[in-house]
């Protein structure tokens, strides 16, 4: 299993599954920050120390298997081309920060559900991604990977403070739990403007699709905990679970209200966006995200039939600049990317609809 295995498909195998509440919650993520006890933090360690971390993971964890999760393979960042690294970021397998780490690495499970980032902000960052609303399941998997690593690594841990991390905001549990949610109706009704400040007051933070500093394009929001100290892992996950459940309910109510009061306007918006995606000859990534959001809403409300939301998950990744260029075989100028993106969307939508039509005719 090589790097090519992880960059050739837009959809990770876990993304092809339908999780609970997947019309609103695209994915659930658990991330655990850990550090070696006897090695200085990445802000201060030497090149030799950084290299020793990668080497230990290559020797002791690469090509090893966890029951129920699968085999892992180690990818060194300095072995990957810039475009390949960008694709891994766009698939949410690694962070943008890791791509800039000269001694960075990533231990990836075959199904891409688990990634262990090495020499990022901390020595070790365990990430588990599950489809739909499955925070508790993701937490269970993260703990399993954490225990597996701890069998061979002594973690930096303090009885009073918990796990020690490079950034003080991660000290304690070292846990970041997050859900990625598609909230178009709350945006359309502008309820999101009062909901975000209320969420922030609960010790949670709302970000865009690629985390800190990113914009919520395509009405996709990432909601995560901010506090890691003074609360148990279970409390952190349960608090986020509770808020996400309320958001699901509010989004469903807003969708129902729009459908009941502005059905024609909503259908017009959905079909216009579908028309753009089906027929455009050039399209930028931001407009693509907006149109994909409208079409996804149309599918979820039964306005558009014969189109799977899975195709939209695929297009979300496939139309990002890195994947688009990787798919096209090399670097593209911005206008070339817009032309290629439009062609790719048309091809995939027409292929999907034709496949559905043939399926219906054969029944």
Swiss-Prot record:
Disruption phenotype annotation: Cells lacking this gene show a defect in the delocalization of competence proteins that is not related to altered expression of the com genes on the levels of either transcription or translation. Inactivation of mcsB also decreases transformability. CtsR is no more degraded.
Compartment annotation: Cytoplasm
Gene3D superfamilies: Glutamine synthetase/guanido kinase, catalytic domain
Enzyme nomenclature, EC number: 2.7.14.1
Upregulating conditions: Is repressed by the transcriptional regulator CtsR. Forms part of an operon with ctsR, mcsA and clpC.
Outcome following mutation: residue 210 to A: Stabilizes quantity of CtsR to an extent a little lower to that observed for the mcsB deletion, indicating a decrease of protein phosphorylation activity of McsB in vivo
Entry function: Catalyzes the specific phosphorylation of arginine residues in a large number of proteins. Is part of the bacterial stress response system, where it is involved in regulating the global heat shock repressor CtsR; phosphorylates arginine residues in the winged helix-turn-helix domain of CtsR, thereby preventing its binding to DNA and consequently inducing the expression of repressed genes. The transcriptional repressor HrcA, the chaperone GroEL, the unfoldase ClpC, together with several ribosomal subunits, represent other physiological targets of McsB under stress conditions.
Protein family: Belongs to the ATP:guanido phosphotransferase family.
Protein name: Protein-arginine kinase
Record organism: Bacillus subtilis (strain 168)
Organism lineage: Bacteria, Bacillati, Bacillota, Bacilli, Bacillales
Gene this chain is encoded by: mcsB
């Amino acid at each position: 299993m090589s790097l090519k295995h992880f960059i050739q498909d837009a959809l990770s195998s876990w993304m092809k599954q339908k999780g609970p509440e997947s019309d609103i919650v695209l994915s659930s993520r658990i991330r655990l920050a850990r550090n070696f006890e006897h090695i200085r933090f990445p802000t201060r360690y030497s090149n030799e120390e950084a290299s020793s971390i990668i080497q230990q993971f290559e020797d002791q964890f690469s090509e090893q298997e966890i029951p129920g999760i699968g085999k892992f393979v180690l990818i060194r960042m300095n072995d990957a081309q810039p475009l390949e690294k960008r694709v891994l970021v766009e698939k949410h397998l690694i962070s943008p920060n890791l791509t800039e780490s000269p001694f960075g690495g990533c231990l990836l499970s075959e199904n891409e559900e688990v990634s262990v980032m090495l020499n990022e902000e901390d020595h070790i960052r365990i990430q588990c991604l599950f489809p739909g609303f499955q925070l508790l399941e993701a937490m269970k998997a993260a703990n399993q990977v954490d225990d597996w690593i701890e069998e061979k690594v002594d973690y930096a841990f303090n009885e009073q403070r918990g796990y020690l991390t490079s950034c003080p905001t991660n000290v304690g549990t070292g846990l970041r739990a997050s859900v990625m949610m598609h909230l178009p109706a709350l945006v359309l009704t502008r309820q999101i403007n009062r909901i975000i400040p209320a969420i922030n007051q609960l010790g949670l933070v709302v970000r865009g699709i690629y985390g800190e500093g990113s914009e919520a394009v395509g009405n996709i929001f990432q909601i995560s905990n901010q506090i890691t100290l003074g609360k148990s892992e279970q409390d952190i996950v349960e608090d986020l679970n509770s808020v996400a459940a309320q958001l699901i309910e509010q989004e469903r109510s807003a969708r129902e209200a729009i459908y009941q009061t502005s059905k024609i306007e909503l259908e017009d918006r959905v079909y216009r966006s579908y028309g753009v995606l089906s027929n455009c000859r050039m399209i930028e990534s931001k407009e693509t995200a907006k149109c994909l959001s409208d079409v996804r809403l149309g599918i979820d409300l039964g306005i558009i039939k014969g189109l799977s939301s899975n195709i939209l998950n695929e297009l979300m990744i496939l139309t990002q600049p890195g994947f688009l260029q990787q798919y096209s075989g090399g670097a593209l100028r911005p206008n070339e990317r817009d032309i290629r993106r439009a062609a790719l969307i048309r091809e995939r939508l027409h292929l999907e609809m034709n496949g559905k039509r043939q399926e219906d005719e054969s029944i």
